[in-house]
């Protein structure tokens, strides 16, 4: 009995010790006890001086140094913010990083204009396709065409996948000429080409515009050429590339019978315009001593030089900027790369260093065998299925096609054509991997 009572006593002592240990552990986690009050006679201790710091984000105006204020509670996100974020998520393509594109106001969109008549439907659609493949910002397409082509443009553009149609809106306009004889304008150089001269008059609500010919292809985001608008000084209102890099073998310097810009003229196949400035400028001219508004100048200018011009509206633009050189910004040839830049030997240094940014397949080179390098690029973009992998379905087949063009002068420099498109595809691929796989899972 004594042994049992001793065992019971020891068990009770052990339980009591365990209970005390638990209580002390719980008390240790609580706030420390307050310090005893300092006697009134005790000397005041001044804290060591603290280096001055900028007030933190929680500091309040008028707070004394050393006094820390509690940060105000974070406001709950408004429903509008959540709605905007939801819209942005819906508007992003798979693999596209978060940006303000989805909620970008319409006045900040890129505006792209093209004039298409006759058999230019397919060429125009391929150009528009190249624009949406790589662009980041939303684009407003302004398509000027004949009545017979309007239904087909609408039909084809609406058949594109949703992930691409959400990147643009399009509007189709009739061919119209506000001054002079419409039939004369329509027959100037190529069918409907003179329409571009009237864009500042027709698109009165558009501030800035990128005009391109139907035979143009974008090999990098349209956003990049749009940024050149920021480089305009206070007098510049349009931008174009030189017609030729070597004036002594250029067309204008050898054959032109009218004034032209600079030493070699400019090519109007890719033209960036500040329409607001164009509409508000009085242009110097050879007809009257005072300036003329853009619309008032066009028909008298055509009447004066119509027997001397060869390249139609491009010649008229050269004449305008001959008398108003301060109004033109000249961008490098990589933004308007044509067969002339390689068929006589490479003569576009910017493209050699940076690669072709905008390809201009003039003289019908997309549809014949004279320049197979240009044709290979056109067919690669035309035949690319929207939802396929860019590297597998466009870039690698393009490299194989380029192997068949090495016997041509343009085909001997494939890196000039591939540099920008490869860089653009890599950027798109890296964004896709980082967004969908995550940076910590890439190794």
UniProtKB/Swiss-Prot annotation:
Residues 67-84 have a biased composition (Basic residues). Residues 1-4 are cytoplasmic. It is found in: Membrane. CDD domains: GT8_like_2. Disulfide bonds: none annotated. Its EC number is 2.4.2.42. One of its GO terms (molecular function) is UDP-D-xylose:beta-D-glucoside alpha-1,3-D-xylosyltransferase activity. Glycans are attached at residues 233, 274. Residues 26-443 are lumenal. It is a single-pass type II membrane protein. Residues 32-84 are annotated as: Disordered. Belongs to the glycosyltransferase 8 family. This is Glucoside xylosyltransferase 2. The gene is GXYLT2.
